[in-house]
């Protein structure tokens, strides 16, 4: 439902054109009925702002219909993806397919978050790189930042001065001083240079198009401090700024097409990367309203585009959206019927030329324009003087025409000219290559020269990413050649042009893997023969990735590709159909249920939202499937309209899909009528997988109607039969009997009850077969293997936990856990195992797992430093985690993220501490809305002994607008229960009278840690409230100093906050301090403990804690020498046996930078051996431990292997647990010495 906008006067100005009506009035509208409500809504919300053009800027709107101010509102809804920090800055993420599952690429952000904490480092970046494809809106976004700052809407508190530079213009200057550079970056002087430079941390430099000029921005004088008035070459000045030898505290925003910035900015520090992905769905539509001054024209144009999924997808790129609008506007002006059948950007450009360039200029003047464009591309020039134009043979009349039609622009600040957009210049350059080559003056030599020029300009690795190369592929396709011949009234030599394509492919393919760039080129070409031939050559041998442990043999033919946008999705799905080595297309990898991935498949990953438009273009491309036989959409939540579009595609005559997976897609009985319509049609579908969907009896009956149709070709149907009634199951069996080719299979077979106690394997199998025959279940096959556990419900799959250790898990223990406490759940599991005779079989789970209907579900560490965890609950039910004491009741499969928070981060900003007492941990929980019906938040108040009312318990929510106190639905021992919760940082507090704080009984825990140093034992003893975030903080702190926890029972009695306790023990123990206060301190604060020096622990010792006031014993523990586990497992021998691998230091660089928490002891051990005095002090001078480690690794580039071995030995001595953890995660072997 749309929210009603606030009644306020809009400050949005509106463009007017030649007496056209004002867009803010609706009195005289005469538009199509379909779009009237939508347009009126946009007008009320102020979503149709004015758009202006500023001379000399890459703004893609016709000058005659727009004013010359306020560019800011044009691209406010560009999709921005903040990437995770690259592991190797010199080899940024390439969009090529691989055999392993890719790591998640980042998350979507708003423009306000560009200089917010980075998702990888949690630091505010000094350098932000805006990257993206050609024409995606990077430059406009950069100008938006400058304008929004100037108007006080963005970063006003962060920066005092913001300077904007177009690098294409900056490259025209030979030498500049810092003062001249700053003056050039301001529209008007704002302050004296001395005042500006006095606060460099408040300066932002925006460098637009940093990769356009042919320069290398090296820091030539890193040690030289230059005066701001001293002039030097521009590239040197910029290199010094980016290299931090000048104004090291300043901030930078760079825009670039390429991610390989290290090539021409060698001193570039680690940036925050943000990729511009183009327009969101609503912004595509809004653009039409911005472009056309006449609202009816806007509606008509967008309706035409919206009816064509390919054209709508192409409009995701702002530059292409401008191209489409311009073509439609020209057709309107010329009185033509609106028609755009273009399927590619190249075809749109040819259409644009045919509509805008008069016939008299096409033969000679357009060729001259193409030569000008090509010369500029090869020399990295985008600005041209009048003499440049004359040199290419462009006359005044032609230049005036090109300016009038918008092909060329004249710069207001100079006498220079430029193309309306860099992409347009690259398109003309591509035409120039073909026209020159087609003259056949030099034959193959000319082709070699063109290809070598392309390689020199873009590099082999980025050749297919270059728009010029993509345009070449498009122009040399059959439709492209026809368009050029018609445009230039000439005949092009097809064979010669085809040779040029093969030259490009041969030159580049050996140097790069199959990537999205190549697919883009092939898509532009659209030639079926070329697509088939090239895609056939891409087979290669795929090696299983590190995450492919479950099906190592079967998944060697699985390839993975990340597609972030609808454009990439369209290109990938179009080309993959010609790839004969892929039989199945899968969108977003989901762990499969009950079937093996046998067919060769391509898995497409997408971290950005999948919209209706995304599904539309996917299904549009699948109407002609060619080599594809299977489609797997498992794990994607599908709306009804999406399934409707899918079924329309499946019924299309050209669609030859045979297998469809819709496992866990949120389907209900309502969807079954759509699927039944496919079964009743002459579709090619033979296998359908519908497990883990709530279809119900009614839905399955609809499917049965489709299955009864004589034209139905389905032979295999997978369903969950456990929730179906006996009547429907009988109906399915009857269908199988009547149709011998039909097999209906199920994961669960609950009606099969076999007493398996004291039966051997043969007896179990025999009994199962007999029972199936007796129940008439013969057609239904029980899918199981020799590795499964066969029991009352048939085969139970054994899950591989660790292949190297031969560790397996049997998770299928069915326990109703609703309203059960931790102890009840564990007891129920034990009882069930005893009753089933499963005593020898251990359920492999830990206290960190969530225990639910099918046993333990592992918790995944997302970000260790932030204490951020993720658990994927596989089905509806109740789940409890013993270590955190969190408890969720969920209605369906859901992924939940849990972050441990510190109360001090939030409470310091509120008066809550005076009236309320913290009585539980603080969690930041994220889950899909509606999936969690109840959450049990732990508290440590003893209800049986407290006089506090359960009405005094509150759940504190910390939200953007402030804090909210919510009354829980229920309070029970150890938990408060919220039903249908909304999530934010949340935890339990208790309303109190301040004087009563020390009379609240709480449950507490004791934590004991030990460290053995040369056979002398030191213990640390803590007494703290039962709060998992505090325990985790203590664990982490003790681990820094190589202390290991010993598990001992907690105090039996309830204790009181503020009470004091005496620590004592056996004779000859040195205890400091001997008195402990039980207090609640936030997990970020220092926790109180007693240090106990034992000496040589040859025999057992006793520890006791007594209440100081009454000297009552509240806790006692006996420590034996056997409680002290060996410090480290075998490492040395593993290292001796290791082959020649990457050194431990290099292999674990990222983890060491993030996790070495005490650098100075490490430096002390390296001092004099590896580090000289200067290097030692240089590392110590860094502010943070992470910066110190980065500096140390920077110095290590010149180290020999022997020096790295010394580093490894020092690290083992100072951080043995970290070394151990890294070795275990890497398989136990990493060459260090």
Swiss-Prot record:
GO molecular-function terms, A-Z: ATP binding; peptidase activity
Effect of residue 727 to A: No effect on IL1B release under basal conditions, nor in response to LT or metabolic inhibitors
Site note (Microbial infection) Probable cleavage, residues: 44-45
PROSITE patterns assigned: CARD, FIIND, LRR, NACHT
LRR repeats: 627-647, 684-704
Residues covered by region (UPA): 984-1133
Note: Three tandem Nrlp1 paralogs, Nrlp1a, Nrlp1b and Nrlp1c, have been identified. Nlrp1c is predicted to be a pseudogene. Neither Nlrp1a, nor Nrlp1c are expressed in anthrax lethal toxin susceptible strains, hence neither of them is thought to play an important role in this phenotype. In macrophages and dendritic cells, NLRP1 inflammasome activation of CASP1 and IL1B maturation can be dampened by direct contact with activated effector and memory T-cells. This effect may be mediated by hexameric TNF ligands, such as CD40LG.
The name this protein goes by in its record: NACHT, LRR and PYD domains-containing protein 1b allele 1
């Amino acid at each position: 439902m749309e929210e009603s906008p606030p009644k306020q006067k809009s400050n949005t100005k509106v463009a007017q054109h030649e007496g056209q009506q004002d867009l803010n009035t609706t009195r005289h509208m005469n538009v199509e009925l379909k779009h009237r409500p939508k347009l009126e809504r946009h007008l009320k919300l102020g979503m149709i702002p004015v758009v202006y053009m500023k001379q000399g800027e890459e703004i893609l709107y016709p000058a005659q219909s727009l004013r010359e101010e306020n560019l800011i509102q044009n691209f406010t809804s560009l999709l921005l993806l903040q990437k995770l920090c690259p592991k190797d800055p010199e080899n940024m993420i390439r969009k090529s397919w691989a055999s392993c599952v890719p790591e998640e690429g980042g998350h979507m952000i708003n423009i306000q978050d560009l200089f917010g904490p980075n998702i990888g480092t949690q630091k505010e970046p000094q350098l932000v790189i805006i990257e993206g494809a050609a024409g995606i809106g990077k430059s406009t976004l950069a100008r938006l930042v400058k304008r929004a700052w100037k108007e006080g809407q963005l970063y006003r508190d962060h920066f005092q001065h913001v300077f904007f530079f177009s690098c294409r213009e900056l490259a025209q200057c030979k030498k500049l001083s810092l003062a001249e550079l700053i003056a050039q970056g301001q529209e008007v002087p704002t302050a004296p240079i001395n005042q500006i430079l006095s606060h460099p941390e408040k300066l932002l430099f925006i460098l637009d198009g940093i990769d356009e000029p042919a320069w290398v921005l090296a820091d030539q004088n890193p040690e030289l401090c230059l005066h701001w008035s001293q002039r030097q070459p521009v590239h040197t000045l910029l290199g010094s700024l980016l290299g931090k030898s000048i104004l090291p505290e300043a901030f930078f925003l760079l825009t670039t097409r390429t991610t390989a910035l290290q090539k021409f900015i060698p001193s570039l520090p680690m940036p925050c990367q943000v990729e511009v992905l183009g327009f969101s769905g609503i912004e595509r539509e809004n653009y039409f309203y911005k472009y056309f001054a006449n609202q009816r024209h806007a509606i008509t144009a967008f309706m035409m585009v919206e009816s064509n999924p390919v054209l709508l997808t192409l409009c995701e790129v702002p530059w292409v959206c401008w191209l489409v609008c311009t073509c439609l506007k020209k057709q309107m002006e010329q009185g033509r019927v609106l028609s755009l059948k273009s399927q590619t950007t190249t075809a749109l450009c040819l259409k644009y030329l045919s509509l805008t360039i008069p016939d008299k200029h096409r033969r000679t003047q357009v060729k001259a324009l193409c030569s000008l464009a090509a010369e500029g591309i090869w020399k990295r020039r985008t600005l041209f003087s009048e003499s440049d134009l004359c040199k290419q043979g462009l006359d005044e009349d032609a230049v005036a025409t090109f300016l009038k039609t918008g092909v060329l622009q004249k710069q207001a600040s100079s006498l220079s000219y430029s193309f309306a957009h860099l992409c347009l210049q690259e398109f003309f350059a591509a035409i120039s290559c073909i026209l020159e080559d087609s003259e056949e003056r030099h034959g193959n030599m000319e082709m070699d020269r063109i290809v070598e020029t392309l390689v020199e300009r873009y590099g082999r690795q980025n050749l297919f990413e270059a728009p010029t190369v993509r345009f070449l592929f498009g122009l040399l396709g059959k439709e492209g050649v026809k368009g050029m011949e018609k445009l230039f009234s000439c005949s092009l030599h097809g064979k010669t042009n085809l040779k040029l394509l093969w030259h490009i492919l041969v030159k580049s393919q050996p140097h790069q893997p199959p990537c999205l760039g190549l697919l883009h080129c092939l898509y532009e070409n659209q030639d079926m023969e070329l697509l088939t031939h090239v895609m056939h050559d891409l087979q290669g041998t795929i090696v299983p990735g590190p995450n492919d442990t479950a099906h190592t043999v079967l998944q060697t033919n699985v390839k993975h590709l990340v597609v972030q946008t609808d454009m990439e999705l369209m290109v990938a799905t179009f080309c993959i159909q010609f790839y004969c080595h892929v039989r199945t297309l899968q969108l977003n990898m989901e762990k499969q249920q009950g079937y093996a991935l046998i067919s060769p498949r391509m898995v497409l990953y997408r971290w950005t939202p999948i919209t209706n438009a995304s599904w539309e273009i996917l299904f549009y491309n699948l109407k002609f499937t060619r080599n594809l036989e299977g489609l797997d959409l498992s794990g994607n939540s599908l709306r009804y309209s999406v399934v409707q579009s899918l079924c329309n595609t499946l019924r299309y005559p050209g669609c030859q899909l045979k297998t469809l997976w819709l496992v866990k897609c949120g389907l209900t009985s309502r969807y079954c009528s759509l699927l039944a319509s496919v079964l009743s049609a002459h579709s090619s579908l033979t296998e359908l997988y519908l497990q883990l969907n709530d279809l119900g009896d009614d839905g399955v009956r609809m499917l049965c109607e489709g299955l009864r149709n004589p034209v139905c070709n389905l032979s295999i149907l997978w369903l969950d039969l456990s929730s179906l009634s006996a009547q429907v199951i009988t109906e399915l069996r009857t269908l199988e009997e009547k149709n011998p080719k039909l097999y209906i299979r199920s994961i669960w077979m609950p009606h099969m009850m076999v007493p398996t106690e004291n039966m051997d394997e043969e007896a179990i199998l025999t009994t199962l077969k007999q029972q199936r025959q007796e129940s008439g279940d013969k057609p239904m096959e029980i899918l199981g293997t020799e590795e499964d556990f066969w029991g009352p419900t048939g085969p139970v799959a054994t899950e591989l936990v660790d292949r190297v250790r031969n560790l397996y898990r049997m998770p299928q223990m069915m326990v109703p856990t609703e309203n059960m406490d931790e102890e009840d759940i564990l007891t129920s599991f034990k009882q069930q195992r005893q009753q089933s005779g499963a005593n020898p079989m251990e359920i492999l789970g830990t206290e960190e797992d969530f225990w639910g209907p099918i046993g333990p579900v592992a918790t995944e560490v997302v970000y260790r430093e932030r204490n951020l965890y993720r658990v994927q609950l596989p089905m509806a039910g109740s789940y409890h985690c013993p270590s955190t004491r969190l408890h969720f009741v969920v209605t369906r499969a859901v992924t939940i993220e849990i972050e441990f928070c510190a109360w001090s981060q939030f409470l310091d900003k509120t008066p809550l501490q005076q009236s309320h007492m913290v009585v539980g941990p603080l969690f930041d929980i994220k889950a899909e809305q509606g999936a969690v019906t109840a959450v049990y938040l732990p508290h440590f108040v003893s209800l049986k002994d407290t006089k506090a009312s359960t009405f005094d318990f509150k759940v504190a929510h910390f939200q953007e607008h402030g804090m909210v106190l919510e009354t829980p639905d229920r309070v029970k021992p150890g938990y408060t229960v919220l039903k249908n919760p909304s999530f934010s940082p949340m935890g339990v507090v208790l309303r109190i009278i301040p004087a009563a704080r020390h009379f609240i009984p709480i449950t507490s825990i004791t934590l004991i840690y030990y460290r053995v140093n040369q056979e002398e034992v030191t213990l640390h003893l803590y007494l703290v409230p039962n709060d998992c975030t505090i325990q985790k903080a203590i664990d982490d702190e003790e681990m820094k100093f190589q202390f290991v926890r010993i598990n001992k029972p907690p105090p039996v009695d309830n204790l009181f906050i503020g009470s004091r306790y005496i620590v004592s023990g056996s004779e000859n123990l040195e205890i400091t301090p001997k008195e402990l206060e039980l207090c609640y301190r936030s997990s970020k604060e220092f926790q109180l403990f007693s240090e106990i020096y034992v000496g040589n622990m040859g025999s057992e010792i006793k520890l006791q804690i007594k209440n100081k006031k009454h000297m009552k014993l509240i806790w006692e523990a006996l420590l034996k020498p056997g409680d002290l586990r060996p410090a480290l497992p075998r490492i040395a021998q593993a290292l001796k046996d290791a082959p020649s691998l990457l050194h431990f230091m290099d292999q674990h660089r990222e983890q060491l930078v993030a996790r070495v928490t005490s650098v100075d002891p490490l430096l002390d051990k390296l001092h004099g051996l590896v580090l000289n005095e200067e290097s030692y002090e240089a590392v110590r001078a860094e502010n943070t431990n992470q910066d110190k480690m980065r500096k140390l690794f920077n110095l290590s580039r010149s180290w020999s292997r022997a020096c790295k071995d010394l580093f490894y030995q020092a690290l083992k001595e100072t951080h043995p647990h970290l070394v151990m953890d890294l070795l275990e995660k890497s398989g136990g072997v990493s060459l260090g010495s």
